[in-house]
A protein has these predicted regions:
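Extended, hydrophobic alpha-helical segments in both membrane/secreted and soluble proteins
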Residues: 144-148, 305
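Aromatic/hydrophobic pocket-lining residues that form the small-molecule binding cavity
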Residues: 1, 129, 162, 166, ...
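Acidic/aromatic-lined carbohydrate-recognition and catalytic surfaces
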Residues: 1-118, 124, 138, 149-200
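Short loop/turn motifs at secondary-structure junctions
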Residues: 140-142, 282
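Conserved alpha/beta catalytic core and glycan-binding cleft of carbohydrate-active enzymes
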Residues: 26, 31-66, 170-319
């Protein structure tokens, strides 16, 4: 990788890495030690409890464990522990992805597993994050795209603590590693850029707006950017190959209305953050359908979509 970075720099190409800041593998040494006891170096790097917080968590865990591939299930927030420590640990998405403990913005005193953001465990995790960034900056990396950057601090509805966390990282990064770029998978530039990021990305799952433009599962259609010489929109299948339920199809909204809704949303995001950074248009990612899905797969259709992407302030092309 260092050799790749060097050769890229020789050609004037910058290199960014993807940073998954919210979880580790359940095979990671930090987690394996944390799973042994509550008084070890990495014990509070993760969130453990001897009970589930409520009936919903119990129901979710029961449903998840019934699945034959439950380790790949995104149901619920807790996983049953098979380790010497407490009965349950908090997962980020899948059970094999235990959530790192960045703390709770508003910890509930009745939930002893909820630590404040300035308690020793969360503070140590923040330092580890800085150490990881410093390591790769030292190898010549020019910046990072941060996975689910808004999700690190728990119970943070007004985003106060996650903004504080990333502002701290930004200040530290600028002081020690100037001229580096931070890009977030956030999907809300008014928060993201205020947190110190240079770039936020328009996501396919944010307020349903991106789907209006690219591919609209709710409307069982190809999105407002699809045009049909015969009028209307062809039906396509959703991300998983299954038809969207008929009772969720909103046939009253026209492609033109969908396009205007997206345009109004996107331009508001751009105009309100113009002096803060960039709100990027993307052609796809690992969670996002490529723009040539379904009927939008001809040169004529793709020219329309790519005209939008390439005209906006910062296009991101997914290869």
């Amino acid at each position: 990788l260092v050799e790749l970075i060097r050769k890229a720099h020789d050609k004037g190409i910058k290199v960014m890495l993807d940073l998954v800041a919210g979880h580790t593998s359940d095979k990671h040494p930090w987690f394996l030690q944390s799973a042994q006891d509550s008084n070890l170096q990495y014990s509070d790097y993760y969130i453990w409890s001897d009970r589930l917080p409520d009936a919903k968590a119990e129901k979710d865990l029961e449903a998840m464990l019934k699945s034959p591939d439950y380790m790949q299930s995104t149901i619920g927030k807790w996983m049953k522990s098979e380790y010497p420590r407490d009965k349950y640990y908090m997962k980020n998405f899948y059970a094999c992805q235990p959530s790192l403990n960045y703390g709770y913005a508003n910890p509930d005193p009745n939930h002893p597993w909820e630590q404040g953001v300035n308690e020793p465990g969360p503070k140590a995790v923040r330092q580890e994050l800085k150490d990881i960034l410093a390591f790769w900056y030292g190898k010549g990396v020019d910046g990072f795209r941060v996975d689910m950057a808004s999700s690190l601090v728990k119970n943070d509805k007004d985003k106060k603590e996650i903004l504080n966390l990333w502002r701290e990282i930004r200040e530290w990064s600028d002081k020690n590693f100037p001229d580096h770029v931070l890009m977030a998978e956030w999907g809300s530039p008014k928060y993201c850029l205020a947190a110190g990021y240079n770039v936020d990305m328009d996501l396919n799952n944010t307020r349903a707006h991106n789907r209006r433009m690219y591919f609209d599962r709710k409307h069982q259609a190809d999105g407002g950017s699809y045009f049909s010489l015969n009028g209307g929109q062809p039906s396509v299948k959703d991300l998983y190959g299954n038809a969207w339920p008929e009772n969720k199809v909103d046939s009253k909204t026209t492609p033109a209305q969908m396009l205007k809704e997206y345009y109004d949303y996107f331009t508001d995001c751009v105009e309100s953050t113009r002096t803060m950074g960039y709100f990027a248009s993307i052609t796809g990612n690992h969670d996002h359908l490529r723009i040539n899905t379904g009927a939008r797969n001809t040169p004529e259709q793709l020219k329309v979509m790519m005209t939008w992407v390439m005209t906006m302030p910062l296009p991101i092309l997914y290869y």
